[in-house]
Amino acid sequence: MTALAASGLRARMESLDLLANNVANASTGGYKADREFYGLYASAEASANDYPGTMPVIERPWTDHAQGMLQSTGNPLDVALDGKGFFAINGPNGPLYTRNGNFRLASDGRLTTPDGYAVRSTQGSPLVLDGTRNIQISSDGTVTQEGTIIGQLELADFTSTDGLVKQGATYFRIADPKLRPTMATGATIAQGQLEGSNTGSAEAAVRLVSVLRQFEMLQKAVTIGGEMNKRAVEEVAKV
């Protein structure tokens, strides 16, 4: 019983890490919540002896890619995706993908993320704009300035998001070498809007409190189990 409670305690500790990160990013644009999935683990020794006991563990944390609410900002450099897909970014070590369209202009005119990574055009190159001229971004990502087409935002989609892993709070990179990006055809772009986090602060806080209570109960169970084991050993020693 003590081992079972200890295993549950470890699983809840992992959950607390995930949930604390969700709470911290509840107001981060384009953030996708981390979720926990509890599985049951049986050791090789237990399986070999047909021992029925199993241990709860977080089998595999997963990312919830559900779309967040779109929020109007009025900033022409802010863009939100409505539908499936990602903005393609030139990261420091290769392509990255994000739902956070909080873009800005670098001193050289490149359209970048807040971290300074260039936003990719459909040609794979950065988009370079004139900060003194009006910027229009259409629903298909075409960028124009005073009637002149500058380029088009590259929108990527994937047959499965299982092969994507988080890099930082709002970026994703391809971890599965077999996974290839395709053109996102089911999404439209809304200029002057941003997609909010898909985890609300209230929801994340409630879940955090719930898991914290479970953690405290399991912690007590481990302590009580340890004391019972100690007393049992002492009683055996008296025999």
Which residues does each predicted region cover?
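Amphipathic alpha-helical polymerization modules
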Residues: 1-239
